[in-house]
Amino acid sequence: EMQRSLVGSEMCIRDRDNGDIYVFSPSYAKTMADKRQQTTLDAGVVRIKAGTEEFDPDYYYSIEAQTGGKSFIRCWHITGDYFLLLMYDRPLTETGFTANQLAIYKGETGKLTYVTGLPSADLISGFGNTPYVENGYAYMAVTTTEGYPSIYKIDPVGAVATKGVSIEATQISGVGKLQPQN
């Protein structure tokens, strides 16, 4: 039943370090008006071990069980089995939900930890489209309703964000690094 519930809403991310594939399902089908499209299953993560083609029957972690029913809208691989998730502020079964929090998911343990060191969630008005990842850290643009947007360096092991440079702009859609051409 888990495989069926993932169709149409999953995000597959390969752990580039060991080849495992993690499939993140935000369970967004809970918001569908048509009962035939709805699901009651939690947002969660399943895994396909490297070298296999089947879901690992012993691997399923509920994101909602760790967050009081909250789900996520996006996820990105950072390093090893660490993933960055853009989280909603309330369950999808409620109205007015917004994605204004970040969390780290550790694949091996299935543990989700909210990132500390960011501005208060009620001040966050947006994030960059995609984090820049380098040397085991994620760099994410964070826009708030107070002040200029800033780039935050996120340490996935400690789930801690450190504020970096602020940019005199209204929003930052992304951050990256230019490499010289040889």
Where are these regions (language model features)?
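Short, conserved, GDST-rich strand-edge loop motifs in beta-rich repeat architectures
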Residues: 23-42, 85-99, 143-144
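Beta-propeller domains
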Residues: 7-9, 18-49, 68-71
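Surface-exposed loop and turn segments in beta-propeller and other repeat-based domains
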Residues: 7-9, 51-72, 112-125, 167-181
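Beta-propeller blade signature
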Residues: 37-53, 98-109, 151-156
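C-terminal structured domain segments
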Residues: 111-166
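Single conserved hydrophobic/aromatic residue that forms the stacking wall/gate
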Residues: 1-8, 12-13
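Structural signature of eukaryotic scaffold interfaces centered on beta-propeller domains
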Residues: 10-19, 71-81, 89, 122-134, ...
